[in-house]
UniProtKB/Swiss-Prot annotation:
Binding-site positions, DNA: R311, R316
Record function comment: The RuvA-RuvB-RuvC complex processes Holliday junction (HJ) DNA during genetic recombination and DNA repair, while the RuvA-RuvB complex plays an important role in the rescue of blocked DNA replication forks via replication fork reversal (RFR). RuvA specifically binds to HJ cruciform DNA, conferring on it an open structure. The RuvB hexamer acts as an ATP-dependent pump, pulling dsDNA into and through the RuvAB complex. RuvB forms 2 homohexamers on either side of HJ DNA bound by 1 or 2 RuvA tetramers; 4 subunits per hexamer contact DNA at a time.
SUPFAM superfamilies according to UniProt: P-loop containing nucleoside triphosphate hydrolases, Winged helix' DNA-binding domain
Swiss-Prot/TrEMBL domain comment: Has 3 domains, the large (RuvB-L) and small ATPase (RuvB-S) domains and the C-terminal head (RuvB-H) domain. The head domain binds DNA, while the ATPase domains jointly bind ATP, ADP or are empty depending on the state of the subunit in the translocation cycle. During a single DNA translocation step the structure of each domain remains the same, but their relative positions change.
Name of this protein: Holliday junction branch migration complex subunit RuvB
Subunit structure: Homohexamer. Forms an RuvA(8)-RuvB(12)-Holliday junction (HJ) complex. HJ DNA is sandwiched between 2 RuvA tetramers; dsDNA enters through RuvA and exits via RuvB. An RuvB hexamer assembles on each DNA strand where it exits the tetramer. Each RuvB hexamer is contacted by two RuvA subunits (via domain III) on 2 adjacent RuvB subunits; this complex drives branch migration. In the full resolvosome a probable DNA-RuvA(4)-RuvB(12)-RuvC(2) complex forms which resolves the HJ.
Region (Large ATPase domain (RuvB-L)): 1-182
Top-level EC class: hydrolase
Annotated spans, Head domain (RuvB-H): 256-344
Any one Gene Ontology BP term: DNA repair
Keyword check for DNA repair: yes
Amino acid sequence: MSDRLISATAQSEDNDLELSLRPRRLSEYIGQQKAKETISIFVEAARQRGEPLDHVLLFGPPGLGKTTLSNIIANEMAVNIRTTSGPAIERQGDLAAILTNLAPGDVLFIDEIHRLSKAVEEILYPAMEDFALDIVLGKGPGARSIRLDLPKFTLIGATTRAGMLASPLRDRFGIISRLEFYNNEDLTRIVTRAADILKVVIDRSGAEEIARRSRGTPRVANRLLKRVRDYAQVRAQGDITADVAAEALEFFEVDPLGLDHTDRRLLSSIIEKFNGGPVGLDTIAAAISEETDTVEDVLEPFLMQMGLITRTPRGRVVTPQAYKHLGIPMNRETQKGLEQNSLF
């Protein structure tokens, strides 16, 4: 699933592209106005006091710039950043090694922080609160605990699932900021900026066409731009207009709403096999041969955001907009069923 062209999850091909396109200062960061203004205030206040920034939790769907914003914070504070992830920190000793090698003021960025084990979380609490590391030496009755002082640092945690964070961990973040899906205007600016960096000739309408199909996600927008650039180079003398962008994205099976074959297959399966719903999550997953978690975490959020599918106590139901988008006519029985489902 992560290899889908419109997947918001990072892919191996994204690494070099994102590094070259990533803004380095808040002034260059497009969109997320509320989060940007909030962080700007806290960063400036910390700089004026000569103190490390308070711990920051960034949450929201993948691909919206949590890693980028973390690097910007480190740049604005003029400190180094150490990057890791929840799954990579398997033991308490792994985290202890990272913490003891931080310099005063450094930023420690932990992606997917909700995937830290409870054992690792336990030594993170005093590190965040008291800038100290509690280490147990020995085992059994003879075991003793020693406390090591740590340099004052800033922890930035990123997660797509804030609800999975343990309350004691979440409560230790002084700054909590949610990143939202981008609007088309901001995405158009992002595409235009990326095209300029990549030296791609693109007009305003071409950038708008790519933005419109990018699912509100900068990572997807940059990836689509790269693919459209290749298509334009071979089929359209290299220049990207609205017509060229639309032609390229249709070729890559990304429709005007940003849906791909997998999205459309999910919607059409509910319509054709279950008369539009309601239908359970496990049944949907089996019908399209996908994992339940993939349907719930990867496919559904965007379809719900676009108003193409809804959740009811009785199961998932497609909306009239989905029928219209897919060009599937609704019979009276289906229309009546959808009206009844909307009451629950």
